[in-house]
Every structure is written in structure tokens, then in C-alpha cells.
UniProtKB/Swiss-Prot annotation:
Cofactor binding annotation: Binds 2 copper ions per subunit.
Family as reported in the entry's similarity comment: In the C-terminal section; belongs to the Cu-Zn superoxide dismutase family.
Region (Superoxide dismutase-like): 88-234
GO biological process assignments: removal of superoxide radicals
Protein's name in the database: Copper chaperone for superoxide dismutase
PANTHER family per UniProt: SUPEROXIDE DISMUTASE CU-ZN -RELATED
Residue span(s) of domain HMA: 11-74
Binding-site residues for Cu cation 1, renumbered to this chain: 22, 25
Keyword annotations from UniProtKB, A to Z: Chaperone, Copper, Cytoplasm, Disulfide bond, Isopeptide bond, Metal-binding, Phosphoprotein, Ubl conjugation, Zinc
Glycyl lysine isopeptide (Lys-Gly) (interchain with G-Cter in ubiquitin) crosslink residues: 76, 189, 216, 241
Cofactor: Cu(2+); Zn(2+)
Length: 274
């Protein structure tokens, strides 16, 4: 189920590269993170600018804490609290409007998958979030197919036994239009969704409990606002890259730029929380 910051959940490990050059940098990072609710353990390695955090907070919130010290931070990898790499993936979400975000998938154990991320540009309120069958964005989000449903079940809520495997329930957007969420799911597996797509919808998912004809099909959550292909991503200590081999940008230069396209060559803009 989706949880807000400080609501607990299963611990995971987040690996960041942080711009640190001296012991005072290390001290500032320790002081900021160790006083934060939801952070259990912090390891800082100045020599390779690495910060390893054991936490129940979404990665975006940990990154914001790190950058509140005045230092840039980039998430490099995720893993279970036992520092095991059981599978990780990421979806970069975009649509025809202003909605955009990044959502990450992490297999915490063979029985539990973590889905966490931040989506901006939403109307305040609840929005349905689902894994869809196809990773096909040729017609924007309309070509992603139906909800991922290999069991042939009816649409339901994330806590239901009888549900589409891609049914992740709702995420809540604040007045700013931002939804930051952390979902733990017992049916979804990272290795089953790589190459598929993640879609956020215009309205609230009724979890199959409404009286609308689409309740048991889509949750009657309205049109698809933004989507992204779910791609394999780095686990802990699997991403040593400091410079992109494709265009020579450092991890600091490419921060806040698109992964590809003309905008990647433009001067860096303040990151849209991604």
C-alpha cells in the first residue's frame, strides 16, 4: 500500500554520490541524515563521495535532505537492507501535458516489491497508478495496452487477492501538484515488469468497488496522463559511472537534463525534482 513519509515500511538501502571534498562535508551529511525520521543508518565515504543510507523514506526525500546541506547528490543504486541486489528498475514518466516524474522499482525480497517515486504536474487529489501490459509508447500512453494481468483477474485494490497484478492503487498529489509515494506490493515482481510500462491516470481509482461499468476493468480512473517504459536499473554498487560515454557529460552536468534529445545539450536547468 502507499505510505507517506514517516509512516514506516520495510527498510531499503540507497546509494548516493554526493559532492564532498572535506571532513566538514561528511559531518554535515551525518548531522542532517541521522536526525531524520525514517533513517536508520548512514555510511559516508569521503574518498569516493559515496553516502549509503538505510531508510524507509522515498529516495527523493533522502536526496532533498542531502542537498539541504548545500551539496549536490545523485542516486546511483538501490538494494535491500541486507545489501542484496534482487532486481531494480526505473520508469521515466512523461505525457502530452506537464505531468512528469520518476518511479523506481526494487525487489526487497522474493515476496515483496517496493515502488517509490515522485510525480509532478498533477491536479491535487488521488490518481490511479498501474503497470500496463506493453512498453509501447508509439501512440503516447494509449498504446501501452491494458493493465498487466497475467492471471486473468478482475480489477481491484492493491490489498486484494483478486486483482490485476499491475494494480497499484492511488497516489496522492498535494496542493503543489506533486505526489511522493512509497508502495510495498506482494504480487508484483521486478523481473516480470521490465519492458512493460507504468501509467498514472487523471482521476481516482475506485479499486473495483464503484458502480461504474469500468470499475472492474480500470477502476474508472479516467484518461492516461503520463507513462514510461520500465527499464532495468542499477542495484547497489553496480553503477560506478562518473562520465557518460555517449556525450562526455559528468554525473553533475547531466543532473536535471533529459536522458536524451535536444534538451540534453542545453545548459543545465534546476532539476524538476527528478
Amino acid at each position: 500500500m502507499a505510505s507517506k513519509s514517516g509512516d514506516g515500511g520495510t527498510m531499503c538501502a540507497l546509494e548516493f554520490t554526493v559532492q564532498m571534498s572535506c571532513q566538514s562535508c561528511v559531518d554535515a551529511v551525518h548531522k542532517t541524515l541521522k536526525g531524520a525520521a525514517g533513517v536508520q543508518n548512514v555510511e559516508v565515504q569521503l574518498e569516493n563521495q559515496m553516502v549509503l543510507v538505510q531508510t524507509t523514506l522515498p529516495s527523493q526525500e533522502v536526496q532533498a535532505l542531502l542537498e539541504s546541506t548545500g551539496r549536490q547528490a545523485v542516486l546511483k543504486g538501490m538494494g535491500s537492507s541486507q545489501l542484496k541486489n534482487l532486481g531494480a528498475a526505473v520508469a521515466i514518466m512523461e505525457g502530452s501535458g506537464t505531468v512528469q516524474g520518476v518511479v523506481r522499482f526494487l525487489q526487497l525480497s522474493s515476496e515483496l516489491c517496493l515502488i517509490e517515486g515522485t510525480i509532478d504536474g498533477l491536479e491535487p487529489g488521488l490518481h490511479g497508478l498501474h503497470v500496463h501490459q506493453y512498453g509501447d509508447l508509439t501512440k503516447d500512453c494509449s498504446s501501452c495496452g491494458d493493465h498487466f494481468n497475467p492471471d486473468g483477474a478482475s480489477h481491484g485494490g492493491p490489498q486484494d487477492t483478486d486483482r490485476h497484478r499491475g494494480d497499484l492503487g492511488n497516489v496522492h498529489a498535494e496542493a503543489s501538484g506533486r505526489a511522493t509515494f512509497r508502495i510495498e506490493d506482494k504480487q508484483l515482481k521486478v523481473w516480470d515488469v521490465i519492458g512493460r510500462s507504468l501509467v498514472v491516470d487523471e482521476g481516482e481509482d475506485d479499486l473495483g468497488r464503484g458502480g461504474h461499468p469500468l470499475s472492474k476493468v480500470t477502476g474508472n480512473s479516467g484518461k492516461r496522463l503520463a507513462c514510461g517504459i520500465i527499464a532495468r536499473s542499477a542495484g547497489l554498487f553496480q553503477n560506478p559511472k562518473q562520465i557518460c560515454s555517449c556525450d562526455g557529460l559528468t554525473i553533475w552536468e547531466e543532473r536535471g537534463r533529459p536522458i536524451a534529445g535536444q534538451g540534453r545539450k542545453d545548459s543545465a536547468q534546476p532539476p524538476a525534482h527528478l
